[in-house]
Amino acid sequence: MVQRLKTVYEQEVIKQLMTRFQYKNIHEVPKLKKITVNRGLGEAAQNAKILEASVKEITEITGQKAIVTRAKKAIAGFKLRQDMPIGVMVTLRGDYMYAFLDRLINLSLPRIRDFRGITAKSFDGRGNYNLGLKEQLIFPEVDYDGIEQIRGMDISIVTTAKTDQEGLALLKSLGMPFAES
């Protein structure tokens, strides 16, 4: 099944960006590379149930099985040993990526309380965008009664854009609701 956002990109966004930035070749046009959804769980080392619940939750939200991230080295101050589970992560590419971004833009972000758009200042200087969410309840896939604790997550949108202006133009033309600054 072809994703709606991918079709929009191929039919409209490429033409818009080629005229705006005067690209000579279609391969110069920035495109989405991957989306990474990450959740750090400091308390997962003590409680395995939290880890399982987070894996299940992130898997439901993204549509792809999440993996458990582990500590690379021991840190005594955090009571952390090497290879202890400390988070959950999933990397989305292809159709899963477009489907997730479509749901994020059109269903989840508008459900945030007092939502006036996301900030355009979260670009990293190379055209990639980072977004932090405070709660998982904005996603329609999450059952309100099935969660014990409200936890946030980090979403990284990696593009092939070389500058922040190109990345912003790409995400804006895909429908990302940026706040007017």
From Swiss-Prot:
InterPro entries, alphabetized: Ribosomal_uL5, Ribosomal_uL5_bac-type, Ribosomal_uL5_C, Ribosomal_uL5_CS, Ribosomal_uL5_dom_sf, Ribosomal_uL5_N
Domain of life of the organism encoding this protein: Eukaryota
Main location: plastid
GO BP terms, alphabetized: translation
Keyword Plastid in annotation: yes
Localisation per UniProt entry: Plastid, Cyanelle
Transmembrane segments: none
Keywords, alphabetical: Cyanelle, Plastid, Ribonucleoprotein, Ribosomal protein, RNA-binding, rRNA-binding
Keyword RNA-binding on entry: yes
GO cellular component: cyanelle; ribonucleoprotein complex; ribosome
PANTHER family on file: 60S RIBOSOMAL PROTEIN L11-RELATED
NCBIfam families on file: PRK00010.1 (NF000585)
Stated family: Belongs to the universal ribosomal protein uL5 family.
Protein function: Binds 5S rRNA, forms part of the central protuberance of the 50S subunit.
Name of the protein in its database record: Large ribosomal subunit protein uL5c
